[in-house]
A protein has these predicted regions:
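Hydrophobic transmembrane alpha-helices and their immediate loop junctions
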Residues: 2-174
Length: 174
């Protein structure tokens, strides 16, 4: 398999396939699970990283979980599905608890976007594999396409150096 950045949007990709402005049930059945996964993996990665760097705050606040409800801001998720812009519930961290404050902030800021990029490439790999063996149905195609889109969008958007996004924390520690 040839895995490259172009694989992110694999065979016969077109904006029509994404049905970006379609808000009917047949579109939401693929978009909502992909969105919940992207939000959950992003925020869980922040929580896990902070915990591993010495900050128990996310664990104490119940954020060290794959349960999407712990990470979901209902209004932010609703707007993300509806208009393409929204937010999740940010993971609270106490930078003073990090064993190495600067390293902790940098690693924690990169954890969410890195998890999203990994999920994006995993979805692309799964799509290529399923397609190669002729096991790609229309539903799986749409779901994996939305998984890639939401995850790559979350990763790059969160790296913008605009407070309170992860990119602004990176810039402040450089």
């Amino acid at each position: 398999l040839n895995i490259s950045f172009s694989l992110i949007f694999w065979y016969n990709y077109s904006i029509k396939d994404l049905e970006v402005f379609m808000l009917d049930f047949s579109t939401m059945i693929y978009r909502i699970p992909a969105l919940l996964f992207a939000i959950t993996i992003h925020e869980y990665a922040h929580a896990q990283c902070a915990d591993s760097m010495g900050d128990p705050t996310p664990r104490h606040m119940g954020r060290l979980t794959f349960n999407p409800m712990a990470h979901l801001d209902l209004m932010g998720a609703f707007l993300l599905v509806l208009v393409g812009f929204g937010w999740a519930k940010p993971v609270a961290i106490n930078q003073n608890n990090f064993r190495n404050r600067k390293e902790g902030i940098i690693k924690d800021s990169l954890a969410g976007p890195a998890a999203n990029l990994f999920a994006c490439f995993l979805a692309a790999f799964m799509a290529a594999l399923l397609n190669k063996f002729g096991m790609m149905g229309d539903g799986m195609y749409k779901f994996l396409l939305w998984m890639q889109l939401y995850n790559v969008w979350f990763a790059f958007f969160n790296l913008l150096p605009i407070p309170p996004l992860d990119g602004s924390k990176l810039v402040s520690e450089m």
